[in-house]
């Protein structure tokens, strides 16, 4: 599995419309993102002329890149990724899982899921899987163990304290030995750290996201029970309330009931994928 291939996915999931500190991000040799107008320039064919299937996947990622703008991680997604990072340094991790076919399947799924705005958590899934693929994709992962340990600790500190700036981590990465294939890993890691920093910075916007989803589910189920069946469509009738009962405020008024329902479904899908990875011995910290 090419480290550079995984890095292209990192570029897609790491860029946010909320990045105000920079106007342009360049991923060497393949992708240029101009944050000022959302314009994406790509020359993917030149990156790997001999692999049409891979180019087709990269083309899909590039085409849907703009749809991923503006959707940030939830705190839960950061914690799940943190757990995966810890597992990466476990010598007992099941290396055969990271075959090119399995990695391609995950990446294709994540790329398609970022097409719809309500699938914000798919970005976290794509990030986690692509980082695993990137680290396992080098010829000799053991040669990167010390640098990866330091990199992991920096990432954890970014999530927990928010005090470390990306530039500090970039400086650390300059000490990663440039063995064959490692240059791409360094670039991939820079995108990963930038995303971790931005995710921490804007985490307050979604700190109550899980509670909102839970309360919304309870409300919809209660409405269906009142109206007498599963075919009840929210919004077609006024909701009856008992004396003294107040209606919970809609904390996501910009989303339709269908979008909220899809968001809940996506959360469950991602949890199931992560659980399967955990059962395979990958997600143990």
From Swiss-Prot:
Keyword flag Membrane: no
Keywords of this entry: Glycoprotein, Host nucleus, Secreted, Signal
Name where it's found: Secreted; Host nucleus
Q: Kindly state the positions of the motif Bipartite nuclear localization signal in this protein.
A: 239-264
Top-rank taxon: Eukaryota
**At which residues is glycosylation annotated?**
182, 187
Renumbered ranges of motif RxLR-dEER: 42-54
List compositional bias (Basic and acidic residues) regions by residue number.
Answer: 220-229
What are the start and end residues of every segment in region (Disordered)? 220-262
Span of the signal peptide: 1-24
Give GO cellular component annotations, separated by semicolons. Answer: extracellular region; host cell nucleus
State the domain notes: Has the canonical translocation RxLR motif, but lacks the canonical EER motif, which characterizes most oomycete effectors identified so far. The C-terminal 58 amino acids (residues 228-285) are required for RCD1-binding and attenuation of light and defense signaling.
Tell me which family the UniProt entry assigns to this protein. Belongs to the RxLR effector family.
Q: What is known about what this protein does?
A: Secreted effector that suppresses pathogen-associated molecular pattern (PAMP)-triggered immunity (PTI) in host plants. Binds to RCD1 and SRO1 transcription co-regulators to attenuate transcriptional activation of salicylic acid (SA)-induced defense genes and alters plant growth responses to light. Suppresses SA signal transduction but not SA levels.
How it assembles, according to the record, is:
Interacts with host RCD1 and SRO1 transcription co-regulators.
How is this protein named in the record?
Secreted RxLR effector protein 106
Q: Which gene name belongs to this protein?
A: RXL106
